Amino acid sequence: MATPDQDVRNRKINPEARMELKEHLREFRDRLIKAAIATIIAAIIGTVFLYQPFIEMISAPLQQINIETGRRANLNYGSVASPFDQLLKVGMYIGLVIASPVWLYQALRFLLPALHTKEKKYLFGFLTASIFAFACGVAISYFTLPGVVYALLKFTPVNESNYIDAGVYISFILKFVVTFSCAFIIPVILVGINMLGLIRGKTILKSWRWVVVLVAVIAALTAPGSDIMMMFVLMAPLLIFFFAAIGICMINDKRRDRKLAKLAQGSDEASLNTATSSEDLAKMGYFEEEKTS
């Protein structure tokens, strides 16, 4: 019985080779198992070595509010099993992040044999741009998160304490980072849609007001602080990414228009250099005109 790697090698040797549905499903299952094993190993490593630094990092704004304002803000684990539950939850998320290269590698090994060279080039370009955009979103959210938490905690009344449920707080942190980071991928998706010819850059540019409104809503949802400057700090990089994507779309449109113009010009020249057949001349009435003359 052929293994998935043997199937891939066979398809490299013979690009026109076809796999049965059962073989596709077996290869998909094996690659999914490999990615899952990598995630479990990465989750164990993340739980042992990275869980405590992660908790210290997200607790830093709470300690800052304690020192600067006198308001008490602490994480609260509401049950006996809650610390262990949060340990597993955070460890799994860390494992998914660490093992993401393995997931990506297994997905590519499964998909690439079915793609042509040009499609592979587009896929690698899209993945590279998406990873870069997502990483930028993670970095920006990492630096802005303490300010967001600090601004929200300042609403705690004076001489009152804020005992935050650990599960709710960790979920808030994860949603903030993931939502803001995914927002950076939207411009990459716009470029991908433009490359497919489904939308033109000028069409997106005409809707620039809606783009600004969308970015403002995303910034307001991910940074609901009392300081309006925090919202503008988050809006700035998103707007730069969006308008850079629009510029790339317009450049791609001009390149595509030039290619289409050359193809049209070439077809016109070919038609001029081709002699008209006798059948076409007969349809045009050329021979009848000769007889009457």
Curated annotation (Swiss-Prot):
Name of the featured protein: Sec-independent protein translocase protein TatC
Quaternary structure annotation from Swiss-Prot or TrEMBL: The Tat system comprises two distinct complexes: a TatABC complex, containing multiple copies of TatA, TatB and TatC subunits, and a separate TatA complex, containing only TatA subunits. Substrates initially bind to the TatABC complex, which probably triggers association of the separate TatA complex to form the active translocon.
Biological source species: Rothia mucilaginosa (strain DY-18)
Major location category of this protein: membrane
A Gene Ontology term for the protein's cellular component: TAT protein transport complex
UniProt topology in membrane: Multi-pass membrane protein
Annotated GO biological process: intracellular protein transmembrane transport; protein transport by the Tat complex
Function, as annotated: Part of the twin-arginine translocation (Tat) system that transports large folded proteins containing a characteristic twin-arginine motif in their signal peptide across membranes. Together with TatB, TatC is part of a receptor directly interacting with Tat signal peptides.
Subcellular location: Cell membrane
Membrane-spanning ranges: 35-55, 87-107, 123-143, 173-193, 204-224, 228-248
Pfam families assigned to the protein according to its UniProt record, in alphabetical order: TatC
Family from the record: Belongs to the TatC family.
Keyword Ribonucleoprotein: no
InterPro entries: TatC
PANTHER family membership: SEC-INDEPENDENT PROTEIN TRANSLOCASE PROTEIN TATC (PTHR30371), SEC-INDEPENDENT PROTEIN TRANSLOCASE PROTEIN TATC, CHLOROPLASTIC-RELATED (PTHR30371:SF0)
Keywords of this entry: Cell membrane, Membrane, Protein transport, Translocation, Transmembrane, Transmembrane helix, Transport
Record-level Gene Ontology MF annotations: proton motive force dependent protein transmembrane transporter activity
